[in-house]
Amino acid sequence: MSRTAEVRRDTKETQIRVWVDLDGTGASEVSTGVGFFDHMLDSFARHGGFDLKVETKGDLHIDMHHTVEDTGIVLGQAIKESLDGFKGIRRFGHAYIPMDETLSRCAIDLSNRPYLIWKTDFRTPKVGDMDTELFKEFHHAFAMNAGACVHLECLYGTNSHHIAESGFKALARALRQAVELDPKTHGHAPSTKGVL
């Protein structure tokens, strides 16, 4: 069973193509025009064990908001599409990720009931050229479109680069657990409702 998806989204603000293979090796080709964001998506693929291709062309002459948020939308849609109705997966995942002085944790439920709890504060308004407020926008867009309930929290940390990166890695590792095939589900959705 191939767990891949390709999603395209074209608006007046952004043109985006995302391809994902949930059963890949962590290989990635990412180009969004935002260097630090590319780094985060590469890290997401590597630590999630997903093969990922992201091509985003956005209205960066205005700012990075549309580029980052819309990439989250399309990545979430691609993950959801590749899961084929959430059948046969473990559904839940969690991870603690340390990065030097920072510790982040993420818990995820692939329930098709999207929600985001975000408890992450940054000490600086930017990491490189990227506004730190955009990290919440990305994670919200991702959760809503992946059908994922995501709780992401930085327990402590002072370096904004480390806070952002440990959060992306925590999401990746939690998602890696949640999308794993579970033989005990016998290919069904892991829910008493029988469907997610």
Swiss-Prot record:
GO terms for molecular function: imidazoleglycerol-phosphate dehydratase activity. It catalyses: D-erythro-1-(imidazol-4-yl)glycerol 3-phosphate = 3-(imidazol-4-yl)-2-oxopropyl phosphate + H2O. It comes from the Bacteria. Keywords: Amino-acid biosynthesis, Cytoplasm, Histidine biosynthesis, Lyase. It is found in: Cytoplasm. One of its GO terms (cellular component) is cytoplasm. Pathway: Amino-acid biosynthesis; L-histidine biosynthesis; L-histidine from 5-phospho-alpha-D-ribose 1-diphosphate: step 6/9. Its main location: cytoplasm. InterPro entries: IGPD_sf, ImidazoleglycerolP_deHydtase, ImidazoleglycerP_deHydtase_CS, Ribosomal_Su5_D2-typ_SF. This is Imidazoleglycerol-phosphate dehydratase.
